[in-house]
UniProtKB/Swiss-Prot annotation:
Transmembrane segments: none annotated. Belongs to the heat shock protein 70 family. Residues 609-642 are annotated as: Disordered. Keywords: ATP-binding, Nucleotide-binding, Stress response. Forms a complex with Hsp83/Hsp90 and Dpit47. One of its GO terms (biological process) is heat shock-mediated polytene chromosome puffing. This is Major heat shock 70 kDa protein Ab. It comes from the Eukaryota. There are 5 or 6 copies of the gene encoding this protein at two separate loci, 2 copies at chromosome locus 87A7 in reverse orientation (Hsp70Aa and Hsp70Ab) at locus 87A7, and 3 or 4 copies (depending on strain) at locus 87C1. Most strains have three copies at chromosome locus 87C1; two tandemly repeated Hsp70 genes (Hsp70Bb and Hsp70Bc) and one in reverse orientation (Hsp70Ba). Some strains, including that sequenced in the Drosophila genome project have an additional copy making three tandemly repeated Hsp70 genes (Hsp70Bb, Hsp70Bbb and Hsp70Bc). The gene is Hsp70Ab. Changing residue 636 to R: In strain: B28. NCBIfam families: PRK00290.1.
């Protein structure tokens, strides 16, 4: 059973598999190689991917996207407050965690970001299963290199809820470097800078690639909250202001108008990557008012100027951390859809004194490509190209504990290789102190109050002794997923305590994960029931229209009038029933089909036999077969719905 690689993106996701010595990026049921990270809830069903994004203007409040901007964060995170201004769906606090509120089948529901992401992951899993023709459980999932511990852990939980065994969480730029290194058959030692600007996150990583098989990450930097959506937001604000100026109407109060404007803005942004001007035309945008305008590339660049410039700071930081200067970088590789923006490219090129940028890998698919390779390696694939690949990644943030006076004492420095393990000895702060509280933080600031708290645990039962005498050994063990285990041991008694940092405030408990796994299965069952219902409805519709058409077109004398009227009456009754019972259950559709078949089949058979008698294989023969298949319907069960 193959393992798959999934690029779980803010706006789009992508899945790949390594087989027969190469990576296949797998297209979804719509034929697209990337799938929107959207989930929609309606009165009757749940939609994921393209169908969800396609109906967003009709159902903005119940269509959820950007779960990656919520995952592993706390509700009071200022970034979330900023995003909520742009989201049509509701985000509420549930014990300090953000939850998304929607209406589904007439009921109010609340979902954790992990659940929404798990639904997207389930869609990617099903896409791969349909292509490979077998069930899949093992996967590698990618995250931005700058994701912190809680964001990584939450992504792993999302995989678990989707029924996946997550072999490894790997960093997106590292996966892209893997794709680049294997695709280009690099020779010798090369320093490669991966510039990854996607829909919602931004990463820069510098790697040394040796003979195209040893991939060593030297440094990483980034912003987990900068990407194409932020550029869209600037353009939407500009267009909404223009609409208000021209027509004295503020469309911001209307989620549907705002959504249609956002879709047009996103399209215009894409156009501006290849043209210097984009036209926006939206009929009846708000209160019946049409909106026609033009946006020039120069205006778009001015609107996003500070955001574009901000992409260079992490580049500088990554170079400093890797102790390299600009001239030592051999290749600059662009990844992520937003790197198609000409201004982003020109700023980066100027920063590197006119050096050519490498545009040779597909920016939308490179990360999934690398993840698929890593999945094959971890599941023991020994084929030619990948058997020698060794990937050495680094920790994006420093990790440490709080010591007297609120000082951050680091045990693991940022950009140290992972997996890694560090031990330091600490002591008590007061005489006869019976226990110590180990508070774990991540971040680069000197004081813990400015860093991100990951978790706390207490080590008690320390024998009475003067301050500074007891020896407490604290060990940090950072695994290959970038997830931390911390243990503390009092040396004289041998008492020990350890935790996997599960970010008590932000993480899901095991019970919550189990509940979500069960709910995910329940939703999958509901989706399956809905699919079967639609299949039964389509079978009935198809049969009734085929029979009706065959009878209406039957040549004169082939069918007596009474039979013809009897069939037509029955068909018209069924069509009327269909029109007034659109939400009937599968069993009702099946029952109607059976009833209709019982009534029409003998007449159709008679008509068919007469036709065959009149002239074997005459036109009637085909009509009969088309219309009935004599009882059981075996015609097409798919109907195009416009």
């Amino acid at each position: 059973m193959p393992a798959i690689g999934i690029d779980l993106g803010t706006t789009y996701s992508c899945v790949g598999v390594y087989q027969h010595g190469k990576v296949e990026i797998i297209a979804n049921d719509q034929g697209n190689r990337t799938t929107p990270s959207y989930v929609a809830f309606t009165d009757s069903e749940r939609l994921i991917g393209d169908p969800a994004k396609n109906q967003v203007a009709m159902n903005p409040r119940n269509t959820v996207f950007d779960a990656k901007r919520l995952i592993g964060r706390k509700y009071d995170d200022p970034k979330i407050a900023e995003d909520m201004k742009h989201w049509p769906f509701k985000v509420v606090s549930d014990g300090g965690k953000p939850k998304i509120g929607v209406e589904y089948k007439g009921e109010s529901k609340r979902f954790a970001p992990e659940e929404i992401s798990s639904m997207v992951l389930t869609k990617m899993k099903e896409t791969a299963e349909a292509y490979l023709g077998e069930s899949i459980t093992d996967a590698v999932i990618t995250v931005p290199a700058y994701f912190n511990d809680s964001q990584r852990q939450a992504t792993k939980d999302a995989g678990h809820i989707a029924g996946l065994n997550v072999l490894r969480i790997i960093n997106e730029p590292t996966a892209a470097a893997l794709a680049y290194g294997l695709d280009k058959n690099l020779k010798g030692e090369r320093n490669v800078l991966i510039f990854d600007l996607g829909g919602g996150t931004f990463d820069v990583s510098i790697l040394t690639i040796d003979e195209g098989s040893l991939f060593e990450v030297r440094s990483t930097a980034g912003d987990t909250h900068l990407g194409g959506e932020d550029f869209d937001n600037r353009l939407v604000t500009h267009l909404a202001d223009e609409f208000k100026r021209k027509y004295k109407k503020d469309l911001r109060s209307n989620p549907r108008a705002l959504r249609r404007l956002r879709t047009a803005a996103e399209r215009a942004k894409r156009t501006l990557s290849s043209s210097t001007e984009a036209t926006i035309e939206i009929d009846a945008l708000f209160e019946g008012q049409d909106f026609y305008t033009k946006v020039s590339r120069a205006r778009f660049e001015e609107l996003c100027a500070d955001l574009f410039r901000n992409t260079l700071q992490p580049v500088e930081k990554a170079l400093n951390d890797a102790k390299m200067d600009k001239g030592q970088i051999h290749d600059i590789v662009l990844v992520g859809g937003s790197t198609r923006i000409p201004k982003v490219q020109s700023l980066l090129q100027d920063f590197f004194h006119g050096k050519n940028l490498n545009l040779s890998i597909n920016p939308d698919e490179a990360v999934a490509y690398g993840a698929a390779v890593q999945a094959a390696i971890l599941s023991g694939d020994q084929s030619g190209k990948i058997q020698d690949v060794l990937l050495v990644d680094v920790a994006p943030l420093s990790l440490g504990i709080e010591t007297a006076g609120g000082v951050m004492t680091k045990l693991i420095e940022r950009n140290c290789r992972i997996p890694c393990k560090q031990t330091k000895t600490f002591s008590t702060y007061a005489d006869n102190q019976p226990g110590v509280s180990i508070q774990v933080y991540e971040g680069e600031r000197a004081m813990t109050k400015d860093n991100n708290a990951l978790g706390t645990f207490d080590l008690s039962g320390i024998p009475p002794a003067p301050r500074g005498v007891p020896q407490i050994e604290v060990t940090f063990d950072l695994d290959a997923n970038g997830i931390l285990n911390v243990s503390a041991k009092e040396m004289s008694t041998g008492k020990a305590k350890n935790i996997t940092i599960k970010n008590d405030k932000g993480r899901l408990s095991q019970a919550e994960i189990d509940r979500m796994v069960n709910e995910a299965e329940k939703y999958a069952d509901e989706d399956e029931k809905h699919r079967q219902r639609i299949t039964s409805r389509n079978a009935l519709e198809s049969y009734v229209f085929n029979v009706k058409q065959a009878v209406e077109q039957a040549p004169a004398g082939k069918l007596d009038e009474a039979d013809k009227n009897s069939v037509l009456d029955k068909c018209n009754d069924t069509i009327r029933w269909l029109d007034s019972n659109t939400t009937a259950e599968k069993e009702e559709f099946d029952h109607k089909l059976e009833e209709l078949t019982r009534h029409c089949s003998p007449i159709m058979t008679k008509m068919h036999q007469q036709g065959a008698g009149a002239g074997a294989g005459g036109p009637g023969a085909n009509c009969g077969q088309q219309a009935g298949g004599f009882g059981g319907y075996s015609g097409p069960t798919v109907e195009e719905v416009d």
